[in-house]
Amino acid sequence: MDKTELIQKAKLAEQAERYDDMATCMKAVTEQGAELSNEERNLLSVAYKNVVGGRRSAWRVISSIEQKTDTSDKKMQLIKDYREKVESELRSICTTVLELLDKYLIANATNPESKVFYLKMKGDYFRYLAEVACGDDRKQTIENSQGAYQEAFDISKKEMQPTHPIRLGLALNFSVFYYEILNNPELACTLAKTAFDEAIAELDTLNEDSYKDSTLIMQLLRDNLTLWTSDSAGEECDAAEGAEN
C-alpha cells in the first residue's frame, strides 16, 4: 500500500475509532523513512496515544482492584496475571513507539518544532513505561524520560514562543512527570506556573491557527495547579492524576 492510501486508511480508522489499525498504518508510513508532515505527525501521535491510553487506564483499574483484594483470595492470582498481561501489551506498544522515534522520527526532524514534538513524545512513552516499571528498570526508565523531556524543554525555550501549543504541551506533560513519577509537587507546580505565566504575558503573540489548542493547554496547566496546590494543602482530595496533553 502506498503512502497516500495508508494515510487515507489511517484517517478512516480514526473516524471509526479503530486506533490499532490507525497506528499500524502510521507505523508503515513512518517506516518508509521520509520526514513526516505536520498532519502525518499528528495522525501518528493520536493513533498511539489512544492505543496506549486504553492500556494505561486498564492497568490503573486492575491495579486498584489488586490492592483492594485480600492476598488469601483465590482471585488474587487471576487479577495479578491479568495485570501482567496488560503490562506486557503496554510495554510492547511503548517499545514500538520509542523505536520509531529513535530510528526515524528524531533523526529525520529538520526543524525545532518537530524535534521538540518527538522528544516530548519520547519523554511521554518512557513515562508510561515508568508507571508500570519497578526496581532498577524503573530508575533507568525515569532517567530516559527526564532526559528526553529536558532536551525538548531546552530547545523549546530557545526556539519557540511561550504560547506555542507544542511548547505548552511539553510543559504540561513534563510537570505531570515531576508530580506523578518523581513525586515532586514543588517542581511540578513551579514548571506549570512558569509556563502559564509566560504564555499569559505574551497572549498577543498567539497564532490564530493555534489559539484554541494553546488556550486549552493553558487551562489544563491551571487545572493541574489548582489540583496540586489543594493536594499539598491537605484538603480532602483524591490524588487524582494531572491532566496531560
From Swiss-Prot:
Residues under site feature: Interaction with phosphoserine on interacting protein: R56, R127
Keyword Transferase on entry: no
Pfam families in the cross-refs: 14-3-3
Gene3D superfamilies in UniProt: 14-3-3 domain
Residue stretches spanning the membrane: none
Cysteine pairings via disulfide bonds: none
SUPFAM superfamilies associated with the record: 14-3-3 protein
Entry's localization field: Cytoplasm
UniProtKB keywords: Cytoplasm
Gene Ontology CC terms, in alphabetical order: cytoplasm
Coiled-coil stretches noted in the UniProt entry, renumbered to this chain: none
Primary location class: cytoplasm
UniProt keyword DNA-binding, yes or no: no
GO biological process: protein localization; signal transduction
Assembly and interaction partners: Homodimer, and heterodimer with other family members.
Family indicated by similarity: Belongs to the 14-3-3 family.
Free-text function comment from the UniProt entry: Adapter protein implicated in the regulation of a large spectrum of both general and specialized signaling pathways. Binds to a large number of partners, usually by recognition of a phosphoserine or phosphothreonine motif. Binding generally results in the modulation of the activity of the binding partner.
Stored PANTHER family: 14-3-3 PROTEIN
Protein name according to UniProt: 14-3-3 protein theta
Organism: Gallus gallus (Chicken)
Gene: YWHAQ
